[in-house]
Amino acid sequence: MARMNRPAPVEVSYKHMRFLITHNPTNATLSTFIEDLKKYGATTVVRVCEVTYDKTPLEKDGITVVDWPFDDGAPPPGKVVEDWLSLVKAKFCEAPGSCVAVHCVAGLGRAPVLVALALIESGMKYEDAIQFIRQKRRGAINSKQLTYLEKYRPKQRLRFKDPHTHKTRCCVM
């Protein structure tokens, strides 16, 4: 059987946050996908495309799969952004340095946009976030998504006040 030429998963690390951006597996390629997740230590997978595989084998391996699909080529809806940032904050405050995998169909649009939002919310400028991701994932983020990220106004949701010093710091530092 001919194997589709898909980009390899890429790790994006920033301030004790680790993301694995990848394409979607199929039931036929699921074992390789699970091996990749284990190699990077990812215990959570965010699936932002339509279902293309059975998540039961991942769950049996202790990997949580979260489904937040949205339209290909489009920016994420507000609810997906809120849920994503809540998950990122909880995951990296609880276990700094852990890894969250996120995938769409090709790993070039929806998944990189969510990672860019996390970088922006933790203090990175949007231009730097895009460049940072594109250095690892060539062709990531289309023009409509670029415009969305340019207009996006962070609320510093991945930062918190230290009750002892009253200074704001990133929750994942």
UniProtKB/Swiss-Prot annotation:
Mainly expressed in cardiomyocytes and skeletal muscle; also found in pancreas. Consistently overexpressed in colon cancer metastasis. Interacts with tubulin. Disulfide bonds join 49-104. Pfam families: Tc-R-P. Residues 8-161 form the Tyrosine-protein phosphatase domain. PANTHER family: TYROSINE SPECIFIC PROTEIN PHOSPHATASE AND DUAL SPECIFICITY PROTEIN PHOSPHATASE (PTHR23339). Substrate binds at residue 110. GO terms for biological process: cellular response to leukemia inhibitory factor; endothelial cell migration; Notch signaling pathway; positive regulation of establishment of protein localization; positive regulation of non-canonical NF-kappaB signal transduction; positive regulation of vascular permeability; regulation of DNA-templated transcription; regulation of vascular endothelial growth factor signaling pathway. The modification Cysteine methyl ester is found at residue 170. GO terms for cellular component: cytoplasm; early endosome; nucleus; plasma membrane. Belongs to the protein-tyrosine phosphatase family. Protein tyrosine phosphatase which stimulates progression from G1 into S phase during mitosis. Enhances cell proliferation, cell motility and invasive activity, and promotes cancer metastasis. May be involved in the progression of cardiac hypertrophy by inhibiting intracellular calcium mobilization in response to angiotensin II. Its EC number is 3.1.3.48. The active site is at residues 72, 104. Inhibited by sodium orthovanadate and peroxovanadium compounds, and by pentamidine. Changing residue 72 to A: Abolishes enzymatic activity. It is found in: Cell membrane; Early endosome. Keywords: Cell membrane, Disulfide bond, Endosome, Hydrolase, Lipoprotein, Membrane, Methylation, Prenylation, Protein phosphatase. Changing residue 104 to S: Reduces migration-promoting activity. It comes from Homo sapiens (Human). The keyword Disulfide bond applies. This is Protein tyrosine phosphatase type IVA 3.
